[in-house]
Amino acid sequence: MSGLRRSIPGADRFLSVAFAFIVLCGSFDFAGADDYPTRPITLIVPFPPGGSTTVMARNVADKMSATLGQPVVVENRGGAGGTIGTRSVAKAAPDGYTILLSYTATMAIAPSMNVNAGYDPRKDFVPIGMIGFAPNVLVVHPSLPARSVAELIAYAKAAPAPVQYGSPGVGTVNHLAGEYLASETGVKLQHVPYKGNGPAMGDLLGGHIPMMFVPIPVALGNVKAGTLRGLAITTAKRSGLLPDLPTLAESGVPGFDVALRYGLMAPTGTPPAVIARLNRELNAALATEDVKQRLATEGAEALPGTPEAYAADVDADEKRWSGLVKKLGIKVE
């Protein structure tokens, strides 16, 4: 359990770089920053079109295009679990015209699992700001005799064999959330990986696997219909979409905080004044009601803030997941 909170060498560097950029923003003017942008900005989404990451990107890109006076063009560049598109931004010119839709999987998990990721989240990127975060919901099939996290833990400890739980694949947040729960509570769980959320949900609804961590939009209808039973939210605070559902921390697992965090990042070396401008326009977009509502349909809550606040969240996620990935020996070649 201590491995999840173990200090990792160089862990403060990412935060230090972010803080330095904020300080510099107030002290220096960079050539070309005053009239930035003078041409379209490319926002790379490192996943195929159609997913929640693309929706997040388009929601903020439309608003930012209007306030920046130049188009923010969303370009999907998927492959290798998001590492191909992310790596391309790391190698892009640090001029503010190529930025990244960053995500928990690509910033905090993939580099720990994939020796060939080709980028270092701390060295190669500087944060612009967070877009929002989306919790998962711990759900069980109604046939499982557990109506709370405490009852689930008691059931799992008494079970003769590890309780199975599904996920859309090895190394996903859904997978690691289960491993994290097992590590924190001492219960034995058996991970059953699927090729995507669809097949996993099919087996969960059919009672072939008893539990799973699922996104809020997936959980909502099923929990309300009674086809699945929601036990807890994975984030530190409750969700406005399921306000009666307690958090795992409230349910006897102190400190449990697992979220999908979405944000914007730029290549390291991007002028601080450009970062400040992008942060300002991102926050303005997130303050609008229509963007908030669109994010809510994806199960996410808008969270405007500073670059250093986003850096701190990414750093905390990286510490948590890299420690767990190392402990479990998970690797993707």
Model features per residue range: what roles?
Residues 38-40, 184, 224, 247-250, ...:
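An extracytoplasmic/periplasmic, membrane-proximal ligand-sensing/linker region
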Residues 91-97, 104, 112-199, 248, ...:
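Hinge/capping helix and adjacent helix->loop/strand transition within the periplasmic-binding protein
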Residues 106-116, 182-184, 211-245, 322:
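A ligand-binding cleft/hinge motif common to bilobed small-molecule-binding domains
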Residues 1-11:
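N-terminal secretory signal peptides that target proteins for export/translocation
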Residues 13-29:
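Bacterial N-terminal signal peptides
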Residues 52, 56, 60, 64, ...:
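Stable alpha-helical elements in mature extracytoplasmic
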